[in-house]
């Protein structure tokens, strides 16, 4: 049969490692995936609309902290990695990954514009016999409601002429507890051949591939993982605020609770940021309304976390007042504006909101972050300042918002007048603890 022939031809290329794989979107998800595919033996075409990224890759320069230049250069040396901004290169691919951003609107509704554009490029420049795998996190149904109709506009049929699946990314920027090949991959295809082909492709990249019944099941899996984290962080954030009122140290309480050998999973309080954890609850609650279902619990957790910048600023202002400040002429030095420790990404960083709120209180703000050279807050561009004695000593308070591993916390506490630590980065500092205020 023709149907079997199309799938069988693609299966042979994937199984033998002779398939050419395209990755659309070379950011925090796409670029590491492209290098993993090269290590898996595939020839890879990286596609991105950002020409500066493409030029950097072609020159062997990495723009991501998690991707060492040496690793990129080693992949280029194999002659199996190319980068381009020309979507016509998609015609050469046997499989195509979509790894583009999925932001939400100001109304906190999903924006699938980038996914749709990627699908349109594949539809226009792709061909029969391709496998398309969406990796971008979105609401359950995106693969079949957004991507599939676009791919089928030109008469190609999913499951017959082309194949389509969803496989959520599971990277943890700034933290690599496991090698990529030890992290299981969940795959849900639109039909059996799509699932089987996607599983076969991933089998060269990871030791375990987990099939689920549909793309929507795989999409829901990803949201469950991230919403689980969001909800539990919200829980501990509320406990933190109660401990504050009761005069208790929430970090002491958490450390004690962690000694229970079963039934307790430790989550740390603080600001929530990035392009997944604070966004994904809204994807899920938006989709739920289509089914006349309201995710009250999840929405409440999201609101709790969204309000944490206000809590941090209010507590900081109280601390300044209690220490003789709060006269409208204070200077705060913010350390770390990335959305989490050890990453070079400020998208959806809670530090932006904190700085905005401080400036509304007439606080002069300077920041230092070795990974974020510039930061835009309400249209104003800030430059990262050097971490000097002057920066620390002239600030009324040093505010730690991202506890980067490279920071010398002993030095920071020694030089600063006061330290407000929103991340518990100073937990191992022994001298000068009377200067430290924690959540």
Model-based region annotation:
Residues 1-439:
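Structural/interface elements that position substrates and couple domains in central-metabolism enzymes
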């Amino acid at each position: 049969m023709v149907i079997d022939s199309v799938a069988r031809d693609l299966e042979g290329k994937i199984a033998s490692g002779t398939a050419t794989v395209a990755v659309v979107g070379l950011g925090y998800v796409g670029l590491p995936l492209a290098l993993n595919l090269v290590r898996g033996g595939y020839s890879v075409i990286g596609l991105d609309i950002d020409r500066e990224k493409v030029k950097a890759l072609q020159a062997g320069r990495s723009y991501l902290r998690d991707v060492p230049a040496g690793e990129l250069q080693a992949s280029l040396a194999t002659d199996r990695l190319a980068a381009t901004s020309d979507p016509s290169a998609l015609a050469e691919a046997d499989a195509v990954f979509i790894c583009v951003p999925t932001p939400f609107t100001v109304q906190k509704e999903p924006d699938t514009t980038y996914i749709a554009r990627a699908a349109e490029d594949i539809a226009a420049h792709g061909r029969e016999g391709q496998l398309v795998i969406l990796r971008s996190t979105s609401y359950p149904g995106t693969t079949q409601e957004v991507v599939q109709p676009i791919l089928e506009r030109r008469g190609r049929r999913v499951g017959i002429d082309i194949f389509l699946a969803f496989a959520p990314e599971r990277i943890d920027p700034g933290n690599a507890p496991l090698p990529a090949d030890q992290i299981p991959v969940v795959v849900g295809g639109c039909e059996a051949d799509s699932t089987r082909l996607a599983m076969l492709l991933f089998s060269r990249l990871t030791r375990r591939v987990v099939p689920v019944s549909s793309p929507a099941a795989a999409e829901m899996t990803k949201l469950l993982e991230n919403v689980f984290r969001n909800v539990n962080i919200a829980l501990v954030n509320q406990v933190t605020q109660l401990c504050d009122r009761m005069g208790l140290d929430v970090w002491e309480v958490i450390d004690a609770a962690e000694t229970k050998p079963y039934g307790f999973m430790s989550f740390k309080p603080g600001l929530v940021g990035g392009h997944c954890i604070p966004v994904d609850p809204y994807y899920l609650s938006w989709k739920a309304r289509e089914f006349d279902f309201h995710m009250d619990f999840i929405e409440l957790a999201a609101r709790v976390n969204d309000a944490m910048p206000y809590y941090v600023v209010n507590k900081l202002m109280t601390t300044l007042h209690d220490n003789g400040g709060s006269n409208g002429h204070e200077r705060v030095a913010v350390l770390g504006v990335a959305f989490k420790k050890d990453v070079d990404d400020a998208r959806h960083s809670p530090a932006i909101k904190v700085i905005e709120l401080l400036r509304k209180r007439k606080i002069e703000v300077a920041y230092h972050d070795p990974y974020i050279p510039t930061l835009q807050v309400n249209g104003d561009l800030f430059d990262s300042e050097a971490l000097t004695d002057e920066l620390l000593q002239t600030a009324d308070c040093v505010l730690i918002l991202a506890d980067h591993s490279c920071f010398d916390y002993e030095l920071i506490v020694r030089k600063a007048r006061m330290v407000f630590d929103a991340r518990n980065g100073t937990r191992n500092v022994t001298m000068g603890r009377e200067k430290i205020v924690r959540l």
